[in-house]
Amino acid sequence: MREILHIQGGQCGNQIGAKFWEVVCDEHGIDPTGRYTGNSDLQLERVNVYYNEASCGRFVPRAVLMDLEPGTMDSVRTGPYGQIFRPDNFVFGQSGAGNNWAKGHYTEGAELIDSVLDVVRKEAENCDCLQGFQVCHSLGGGTGSGMGTLLISKIREEYPDRMMLTFSVFPSPKVSDTVVEPYNATLSVHQLVENADECMVLDNEALYDICFRTLKLTTPSFGDLNHLISATMSGVTCCLRFPGQLNSDLRKLAVNLIPFPRLHFFMVGFAPLTSRGSQQYRALTVPELTQQMWDAKNMMCAADPRHGRYLTASAMFRGKMSTKEVDEQMINVQNKNSSYFVEWIPNNVKSSVCDIPPRGLSMASTFIGNSTSIQEMFRRVSEQFTAMFRRKAFLHWYTGEGMDEMEFTEAESNMNDLVSEYQQYQDATADEEEYEDEEEVQADDM
């Protein structure tokens, strides 16, 4: 079986992760003690992707939980599904990273990283054929960003041929938690560009907007936001866990979505987004799902896909529906909005269909798009970064942990390179591509 090892780090990562396990347990009919109480063989058929079966018939998540302070871990442990995790897989320090990337990456985090890697190794050895890792973290804090990227680079060294998927919560434009978020995020992106295979970009503000506008929640809590994220996370891997007509896995996803290795930051969306009360009154159709899924208001990060072009996209449908109809709808979207797709990648929308819908819905879909408009997010963070960095504001917190200003300069230029790469492919046309090839050929002849 193609197992996925789940790692959650920092306060944000642990809260998203806890919500995600609630959703996955529910889909597989596993109760908070790890016993199976479901009613369908399909739930058990590939339960191994995310669970290890213990000797007494209990299912234990393949999850590693880490943090540099015990607080969030305690609340996960006392939460609804706290008892299902393997107690040894909680790895935590006492000091906290204090929203300081350098503490997470170089000092406090570096002291804890070996015990985390031990647990990761143990879990990986329990796998039959490990497909890859999924990491939940935020990029604005200290632990999720600093220690999270440290762990990603260590895992990359040890398991170079396994997929590395991250769910990364970027700092929001208007909702700021700490003043040094731009520093932490830029230093993290510098790592993610090099070491991760696929990054699903999330952002609190976009999630707030969805809750507020679409779900009509007047005061959304982090619980509501995390619920949206976990629905998407579950959708990304549903093809691995349930039988379907068109399957996809992490590697197929990467092959279909990443035209150039550095451009692996995706926007995600989920449909149907209906408020909790009104769900049961509406039957959904594939066209409605498709329309909502491609809607800019549905994107879970603060970038507008209408300001850029899609290099590639992937749509994962769940529920009983005709594959033919799905294909027709996808072609339809591409024909109607052809200006929003780059013309030099033909057939750049992949779709997959999984037969089992999420709890409480007849059908649902998850959208993953590789759009050049994601550069808006990087641009925004970069501007905030530069505003502080050119005055060397708050730098002593980082240099005091042994960092060098050079690292900041490198991270900044790497992020700006990323932005210009996205811009370059946004502006590229098919004719230019041919022209460049001819030039290269002439150069080779000389």
From Swiss-Prot:
Residues 426-446 are annotated as: Disordered. One of its GO terms (molecular function) is GTP binding. GO terms for biological process: microtubule cytoskeleton organization; mitotic cell cycle. Mg(2+) binds at residue 69. Pfam families: Tubulin, Tubulin_C. Keywords: Cytoplasm, Cytoskeleton, GTP-binding, Magnesium, Metal-binding, Microtubule, Nucleotide-binding. The keyword Cytoplasm applies. GTP binds at residues 11, 69, 138, 142-144, 204, 226. InterPro entries: Beta-tubulin_BS, Beta_tubulin, Tub_FtsZ_C, Tubulin, Tubulin/FtsZ-like_C, Tubulin/FtsZ_2-layer-sand-dom, Tubulin/FtsZ_GTPase_sf, Tubulin_C. Residues 429-446 have a biased composition (Acidic residues). It is found in: Cytoplasm, Cytoskeleton. SUPFAM superfamilies: Tubulin C-terminal domain-like, Tubulin nucleotide-binding domain-like. Dimer of alpha and beta chains. A typical microtubule is a hollow water-filled tube with an outer diameter of 25 nm and an inner diameter of 15 nM. Alpha-beta heterodimers associate head-to-tail to form protofilaments running lengthwise along the microtubule wall with the beta-tubulin subunit facing the microtubule plus end conferring a structural polarity. Microtubules usually have 13 protofilaments but different protofilament numbers can be found in some organisms and specialized cells. Belongs to the tubulin family. Tubulin is the major constituent of microtubules, a cylinder consisting of laterally associated linear protofilaments composed of alpha- and beta-tubulin heterodimers. Microtubules grow by the addition of GTP-tubulin dimers to the microtubule end, where a stabilizing cap forms. Below the cap, tubulin dimers are in GDP-bound state, owing to GTPase activity of alpha-tubulin. This is Tubulin beta-6 chain. It comes from Zea mays. The gene is TUBB6.
